C-alpha cells in the first residue's frame, strides 16, 4: 500500500487485521469488506481497527445495516474482495480456509492469484501450498506482488518495504517504513 496500491481485505482477526494495519502503517489506503451490515456488533475487539480504517480508507459491505454475520455471508464477502482486486494474495490457508473460496472467486473473475509458500509439515499451509501447485504465483517478498502492476498503476516499487522491514515495524511501531508521497 505504501507504493500507491490499494489494500483490500476482510476486516477479520489475524492476517486480515495485519494487512489493514500494514497498509496504514506504510501510509497507504485500505478497504475492509465486511461479512455483515454496518452497525453490527461483530468482532467488537476489531472496532478500533475499523475506526482507523474509516479514517484511512473505507468499510464496504453489500449487506443492509445491522445484518448479522453468518456462514452464508462470508463467501459473498469473499467474492467482493476478489472482485475489487486486481490480484489476490493468500498468506496462510489450511485446506478448508475461507481464503480458498476467495481464491476460487478470483480465478473465476480472471484475477491473478498469489500465495506465500509455507512448511509442508504444517496443515496451516496445506491450502496455500495447493494453490502454488495449481499455478498461483509464488510471493516471498512484497515487491513480487506489485511488480506486475507497477507500470499500469504507476506504483513506486522503491516504497515497498521488505519482509524484514515489516517485521521490524511490527515489533517497533516507530520503525521507519518507506512512505507514500502525500503531495
Label every model-predicted segment.
Residues 1-183:
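Glycine-biased, small-residue-rich flexible motifs in mid-sequence functional cores and linkers
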Amino acid at each position: 500500500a505504501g507504493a500507491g496500491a490499494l489494500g483490500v481485505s476482510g476486516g477479520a482477526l489475524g492476517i486480515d487485521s495485519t494487512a489493514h494495519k500494514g497498509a496504514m502503517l506504510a501510509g497507504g489506503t485500505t478497504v475492509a469488506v465486511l461479512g455483515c451490515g454496518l452497525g453490527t456488533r461483530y468482532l467488537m475487539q476489531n472496532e478500533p481497527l475499523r475506526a482507523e480504517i474509516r479514517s484511512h480508507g473505507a468499510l464496504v459491505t453489500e449487506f443492509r445495516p445491522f445484518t448479522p454475520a453468518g456462514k452464508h455471508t462470508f463467501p459473498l464477502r469473499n467474492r467482493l474482495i476478489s472482485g475489487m482486486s486486481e490480484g489476490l494474495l493468500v498468506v496462510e490457508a489450511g485446506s478448508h480456509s475461507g481464503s480458498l473460496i476467495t481464491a476460487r472467486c478470483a480465478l473465476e473473475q480472471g484475477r491473478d492469484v498469489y500465495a506465500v509458500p509455507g512448511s509442508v509439515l504444517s496443515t496451516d499451509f496445506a491450502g496455500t501450498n495447493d494453490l502454488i501447485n495449481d499455478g498461483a504465483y509464488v510471493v516471498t517478498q512484497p515487491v513480487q506482488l506489485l511488480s506486475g502492476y507497477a507500470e499500469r498503476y504507476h506504483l513506486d516499487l522503491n516504497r515497498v518495504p521488505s519482509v524484514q522491514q515489516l517485521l521490524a515495524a511490527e515489533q517497533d511501531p516507530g520503525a521507519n517504513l518507506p512512505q507514500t508521497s502525500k503531495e
